[in-house]
Amino acid sequence: AAQAVAVAKANAKIQGEAVLLAPQKGYGEVSWKTPIEINAFEVPVKEKVDLLLNVNDVAMQNGASFVNSAIFAVNEQKYFASTDGSYIDQDVHRIYPTFNVTRIDRTSGQFKTRNSLSSPMGKGYEYMHARPEDKVSGIVTRYKGRYDMLEDVKEAAKVASEKIKAKSVEPGKYDLVLDPSHLWLTIHESVGHPTELDRVLGYEANYAGTSFLTLDKWKSKNFKFGSDKVNLVADKTQVGSLGAVGYDDEGVKCKKWDLIKDGVLVNYQTIRDQAHIIGEKESQGCCYAQGWDDVQFQRMPNVSLQPGKTKLSVDDMIKNVEKGIYIIGDGSFSIDQQRYNFQFGGQIFYEIKQGKIVGMLN
């Protein structure tokens, strides 16, 4: 604490302008906890190890040449106190089961992989106990709410073998149908990071640069980010999500707000010393610190594309596609230093012809 005060005093000597913190009321003694059913740290290590060994065994039985698997679990216990009068106790849980399956064709020397289609979640170990309603059926089974690791790895091993035999895509122009397991990374990199106000202002340029969503575009109130059907929201309150907490690391209560509304850029992500720059009276609660001994700074909340008015299946989405590719899972990616031009790979690719999936592509 004494060192922090000394650093602050030293920085003040070369400060160009005063730091303006958005007002923040004190909440007194409050607490927040990730709503979980099973604490992953109370599950015996043997039970987790046995599950992973079973995952590996199922993969090998279904054609995998190599497989590795893991379950990452985090329990962050955080206490925040401020001179605003907030004393906030938070108990945050996160979990992420994952695997990577490789299939080698020793005759041709080709090899293909498929990773898990799980998601890191703000949940307890109940995430590992999938129910029928948690499964989204289709050409590949996907999951919501909970995850079946054994079922997914069995399918993954078979898909890796299919990928070796799949034909190469022919160069040309295609309509793309993007599965949520793929689209999340596109949203994260081309919407989430570009709407971080510190990147917009040039304060942050680490790991793929600043932002093309400059203040003049926001001030115009008519910058078209996408079609009228595109609505993207920031939300740190979504139950079960990876980014959900009760309060950020400046003691700001978390909330939900619009970033893109009817295809138009309407807002950014802010913390307390940025809010006044865009005329906001309060922070949007986007401040994170890695630990008590690190300076907190801006980091995106959950950023999500909102569903349309009509519920659609994959078949509904592809039925009018004459020539397209349906992409499942995330792969390699690259993006320019303003996050404007980008490419995102996938894991599984299916060719669409005349509204039907006709086969797998490489």
PLM regions and their residue ranges:
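N-terminal small-residue-enriched
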Residues: 1-362
